[in-house]
Design a protein with these regions (language model features):
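Hydrophobic/aromatic-rich alpha-helical bundle segments in the mid-to-C-terminal region
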Residues: 106-107, 111, 123-170
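Amphipathic alpha-helical packing segments from all-alpha helical-bundle domains
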Residues: 56-57, 84-94, 99-132
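Solvent-exposed, amphipathic alpha-helical segments
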Residues: 4-11, 58, 96, 137-144
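Short, basic, alpha-helical segments at the C-terminal edge of helix-turn-helix-like DNA-binding modules
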Residues: 49-54
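Hydrophobic alpha-helical connector segments
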Residues: 57-90, 134
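Helix-turn-helix
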Residues: 4-42, 46
């Protein structure tokens, strides 16, 4: 159901989510959606939780595998380029992510991703202000990539990350 919800958000936006559209997308009867999710907010919250948890886990894996330095910047640049290469999925994620701006009860879910991104930045710097800037920049760069016909590639993302995290071991 959650994957079906994400596909509906990708295709129709969050406003297109209903028990009926999600069940149809999942190839299930509408009663299945209403059985597992009482309301539309429950579906949207579950989808947001899923993508935030998945993104946070991916960021934590990347940080653990590279441990800081130029390799981690390059790996993050590669990850960002891979993410923007599938703009529909990224758009669905950001639509759900921005839902938390209007619904305070969803903000806790977004913190999982923000904490993982901050942990990645802390592997490069002890400066709390720089950590916040890096996290905001990652979000901003991904969001801006949705607004262009030619999103940045690995090399361009890596150069931007080098400017944000200049003290990583080169």
């Amino acid at each position: 159901m959650i994957e079906a919800t994400l596909r509906v958000v990708e295709r129709d936006g969050a406003s297109g989510v209903s028990h009926r559209t999600v069940a149809r997308e999942a190839g299930l009867p509408t009663t299945s959606a209403t059985y597992y999710f009482r309301g539309i907010d429950d579906l949207l919250c579950a989808a947001l939780t899923s993508v935030m948890t998945e993104d946070a886990a991916r960021m934590r894996r990347l940080a653990a595998e590279t441990g800081g330095g130029v390799d981690s910047r390059r790996s993050l640049a590669r990850l960002m380029a891979d993410v923007v290469a599938v703009p529909g999925h990224l758009l669905a994620e950001y639509e759900l992510y921005l839902l938390a701006a209007r619904r305070p009860e969803l903000r806790e879910v977004t913190q999982v991703w923000l904490d993982a991104a901050a942990d990645f930045a802390r592997a490069h710097t002890d400066d709390p202000t720089r950590v916040r800037v890096v996290v905001a920049a990652i979000d901003g760069l991904l969001l801006q990539a949705l607004l262009t016909d030619t999103p940045p590639g690995v090399a361009e993302f890596e150069e931007m990350l080098r400017m944000l995290l200049p003290h990583a071991t080169d």
